[in-house]
Amino acid sequence: TEEEIDWVRSKEADKGLPGKIVEASYFGYELNNRQEADFETVGAELKTTAADYDEATARYKSGETISVTQIDFRRPVETDFYASHLYDKLRMLIVIFYHRDRTLASKLLYRVFFASLFRPSEEDIAIIKSDYREINRKIRAGQANTLSRSDGTYLSTAPKAKKRTNMITPYYGGERVVKRSYTLRKEYVNVILSGYYTRREPEEHLITDLHELDRMGFAQIVQGRFSQYVGWDIWDIVGTLNLHAEQTRDELGFPDIPVGVMNKATLPVITARMLGLRSLKCEEFTRAGIIVKTVFFNRHGINKEKFRLGDVDFMEIYNAPAPHTEMETDDDGNEEEVYQTGWEESELFAQLDSIKYLFVVFQKDADGDIIFMGSKLWAMSDEDIEEARQDWMDIKSVLTHGVQLRIGNDGRTYNNFPGVAEARCIHLRPHGAKAFYVNADGTSWGNGCISDTEPLPDGRRMTRQSYWLNNSFVRKVVRDLITVE
């Protein structure tokens, strides 16, 4: 009806608008947040979600997590996973993907391009069940306030409220909490989306005995694989794993160690062998979006590595809406006032919301030996995401008020974006070796070319930048694994 069309147009800013339109117009649904599956007869749950098009790979990729069902903090948890509302909704999903084309003037122009009837595999259900158990362990211990996006391997939790109003007193006690829902991680949603393309060859599995997941969580299993090697010199690990012959110091990644012991024993191979894998490409890591990173510390507990996240699109940040308040409809159909900054629609948020690192930590001791210190499976917590948001807002402020470029006495070009010393956890710096700058009048300088640049809002161009995790931030994450002399 005209009235319904007018209502839809008034909700243009609502992040969930495309999904609500599909569910209401195509399936005739009223907005609901029922605990039962949407199609009760066949036990299927309907989900509509965004996908972005990656020009580099010429493929669609998942644009967000999928919220499966709300966590009811006011009631006792269901300890039997198979009797839970989560399993009821998760066992069969109808997932509709639409292309989130940010170049279009309206969300109403987004195009639906793929629908999938998806059943999680037995292996996936085993890991999700383990995630569910670990999340509920926190809730039952009165620690619901410690739940975070970093929980879980395939299944996580995410806050439902945009502001801390209507806080809930949990059934099991502890601090009051905001609404949260069980969510499927973005990389797992990519597994569903991969059905749009030719099916890929399966990778090897880290977990071959699913009963392991009845005894411990995925993170504990990973740590268990590494635990026998903690405190070992790297050469003892190499010998035990039977990785012999010659390798240059630079190829190995340890410039200070003597040459001469290994065959095909690059760090990824050493790490994979400790895990019992042939390579670091395994099904569990792919589906959870786990990236393995080796971190080196000197005897004083200092690391040099800064981890690159992805390239920066200055115009995407600049064009994000200015901070403002607007009305949005929640999953219960109620309107609430929310504070919008454009952050949750940004490329950086999309990366950080899905990223999960397996940090493999080595440290040089007083004798100069390289010791394996342990591992940590880590994802950004809600608090970390908030720090990153503040860094992103600082970058946006520079773009809004003007990027300043200055040529120093050393001939290098400096800018006024916050540096690693000012940033909380994320800073900008170039990824490539080439630098190039173009003024609005067409004059240019640098040792690169136009393809090494990104446009600025005022018509100039500057060397392409990337987001990087601060080395001090990484140090804070793994500080319990290292020693400081």
Language model features: what each stretch is:
Residues 1-43, 48-485:
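Nucleic-acid endonuclease domains
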